[in-house]
């Protein structure tokens, strides 16, 4: 009697894992309103980490350094001294 000993081997080798392949979600920082744009009170003007831009007239700063409008008006990005920037909101002339 003929006896066959068949052995089947895997066609793919065991694949190693990788340490790459993931990234954090973007935080969507930056300007949310443009210079000269009309905004309502409470509108977010600029999202940031730290004080890249300082709050000016009628602008508040949140716990995460987000700048927001305190009143309805027009946004104005300005220089504050030589090396600083600020954003202000001025009441729209009626």
From Swiss-Prot:
Pfam families: Ribosomal_L27
Record's keyword annotation contains Cell cycle: no
Region (Disordered): 13-32
Propeptide segment residues: 1-9
Biased composition (Basic and acidic residues): 20-32
Signal peptide: none
Matches recorded under NCBIfam families: L27 (TIGR00062)
Family to which this protein belongs: Belongs to the bacterial ribosomal protein bL27 family.
Protein name: Large ribosomal subunit protein bL27
């Amino acid at each position: 009697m003929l006896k066959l000993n068949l052995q089947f081997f895997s066609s793919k080798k065991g694949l190693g894992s990788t340490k790459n392949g993931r990234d954090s979600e973007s935080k969507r920082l930056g300007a949310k309103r443009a210079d000269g744009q009309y905004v309502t009170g409470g509108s977010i003007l600029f999202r940031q980490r730290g004080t890249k831009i300082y709050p000016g007239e009628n602008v508040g700063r949140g716990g995460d350094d987000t700048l927001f409008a305190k009143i309805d008006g027009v946004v104005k990005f300005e220089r504050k001294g030589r090396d600083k920037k600020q954003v202000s909101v001025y009441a729209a002339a009626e």
